[in-house]
Amino acid sequence: MSTDKTNQSWGGRFSEPVDAFVARFTASVTFDQRLYRHDIMGSIAHATMLAKVGVLTDAERDSIIDGLKTIQGEIEAGSFDWRVDLEDVHMNIEARLTDRIGITGKKLHTGRSRNDQVATDIRLWLRDEIDLILGEITRLQKGLLELAEREAESIMPGFTHLQTAQPVTFGHHMLAWFEMLSRDYERLVDCRKRTNRMPLGSAALAGTTYPIDRELTCQLLGFEAVGGNSLDSVSDRDFAIEFCAAASVAMMHLSRFSEELVLWTSAQFQFIDLPDRFCTGSSIMPQKKNPDVPELVRGKSGRVFGALMGLLTLMKGQPLAYNKDNQEDKEPLFDAADTLRDSLRAFADMIPAIKPKHAIMREAALRGFSTATDLADYLVRRGLPFRDCHEIVGHAVKYGVETGKDLAEMSLEELRKFSDQIEQDVFAVLTLEGSVNARNHIGGTAPAQVRAAVARGQALLASR
C-alpha cells in the first residue's frame, strides 16, 4: 500500500509514491506538533521580512499572517487535523495555510528550507522552556531559603560516608542544596545565550539567493544574533546537548536530595515528615506511607542522563550539513525538559512543607561521637599539635565505644586519662550548640552564618 505522492511537497522528482509504512516511519508530526506555536511565530516573522524586501506584497503578507493566526487558533481549540502523510509540523501548517488562503500560502516557504525552519523552531521552543525551568529553580530556592531561615538553629548530625561526622544545623544543610541549584541556574542561563542564535535564513545549507534581511527576522523573533555560518546553523545541535548536560547536572542534584529525603522519612531515621499529599500508600500493607515524589525524581534522573547520551550518540557520526538523523533530536530533548521542569515543580511544592523532627534529629546528633573534632580542636588551642590531638581523641573515642559513653557523657576524670590538658571548660565545647556556634565563618554551620547566607540568597533571587 502506498501514499499519494501529491501529498508531498517534494514529490515532483519521484516516479512512485512513498510506501505507506515508510511514510509513517519517517513522519515526526506525532511528536513535533508541540512546536506549532514557535513554527507559526517563525513563519510570521519570515513573511514579514519577505514583504519588507519585496518578495511578498503587503497583501500577501497580511493574508499569510491572518491565516497562520487562524490555524494557531484551530490547533489550540483542538480542531486541527494533524496528518501523518504530511510528515511534520511544518508541512501540516503550510498545507492548511494553502487550503485556507490559496496559492499565496505556497509562497511562504520562499527563501527558506525545513532545515533552517526546524532549527529555528527548536531554539525558540528551548528558549521558552529554559525560562520556565529557571522560574521553577527560583521557586524551589525561595522555599529552601524559607526553610533554612526557619530551621537556622535546629541541630542534626552531618554525615560523611553516611556515618555521623559533625553536628550541623538543618538550615545549613538546606542551604547546600540552594548553592547547587544556583550553579544549575547559571548553567542554564549560559545555555540560553548559546541557544538564542537564529538559524533562519540559512535555508537548506548554503543560504539563499533572495535578498533576505536576517537582522530584521532576528529582531522580530527576539534572538540575540544571527548564526554566522549556514552549514553550522542547520546541522549542529550542540545547544540541545548543552541543555541536556545542564539538565543532567540539575537532575543529579535533585536525585541526591531525593535520596536524603527517602532516608530521612524512613523508620530508621525519622528526621522529617512529608505531608500526605506528597506520599502514597501500599495496596497490601496498610501502615505504609511511601515517599513517592522523591523516589520518582530519583528514578527520573536516568531519563535525562539517557537523553544526553542519546543526543551525543546521535550527532557523533554526522557529516555536514543536515541529515535525517536529526529528526531524532526532539523526543529526548522534549523529555529531558519536561522531566526537569516537572521534577523541579514537585520539589518546589514539597520542600516548604517539610516538617523536621527536632528531638529525633538532636538525639541522633548526640550519638556517634559527633563532637570528637571539637575535642581535638580544644586540645590544639591548648598548644598541642593537631596530629597528637587526633591520636588522643581517637583513644578517647575507643574508650567510649567500649564503655557505651559519648564524649560529653564522660566525667572530667575519665577525659583527663587521655590528656591532662583537658579542664572543666571542655564540656561547653562538647555540647551540640557549642560545636555549631564555633563554626562562625562564611559558609559555616553556625546559626548566625545560616541567617547571613539566607540574606545573601534572598538578595540573589531579588536580582534575577
Swiss-Prot record:
Any one annotated GO CC term: cytosol
GO BP terms: namely: arginine biosynthetic process via ornithine; L-arginine biosynthetic process
As for subcellular location, the record says:
Cytoplasm
Name used for this protein in its record: Argininosuccinate lyase
Which pathway does the UniProt entry assign to this protein?
Amino-acid biosynthesis; L-arginine biosynthesis; L-arginine from L-ornithine and carbamoyl phosphate: step 3/3
Q: Which GO terms describe its molecular function?
A: argininosuccinate lyase activity
Provide the primary localization. Answer: cytoplasm
UniProt family annotation: Belongs to the lyase 1 family. Argininosuccinate lyase subfamily.
Q: Which reaction does it catalyse?
A: 2-(N(omega)-L-arginino)succinate = fumarate + L-arginine
Q: Which gene encodes it?
A: argH
Q: Which domain of life is it from?
A: Bacteria
PANTHER family referenced in this protein's UniProt entry, alphabetically:
ARGININOSUCCINATE LYASE
Task: Specify the species.
Answer: Pseudomonas fluorescens (strain ATCC BAA-477 / NRRL B-23932 / Pf-5)
Q: What class of enzyme is it?
A: lyase
Matches recorded under InterPro entries: Arg_succ_lyase_C (IPR029419), Argininosuccinate_lyase (IPR009049), Fumarase/histidase_N (IPR024083), Fumarate_lyase_CS (IPR020557), Fumarate_lyase_fam (IPR000362), Fumarate_lyase_N (IPR022761), L-Aspartase-like (IPR008948)
> What Enzyme Commission number(s) does the record list for this chain?
4.3.2.1
Keyword entries, A-Z? Amino-acid biosynthesis, Arginine biosynthesis, Cytoplasm, Lyase
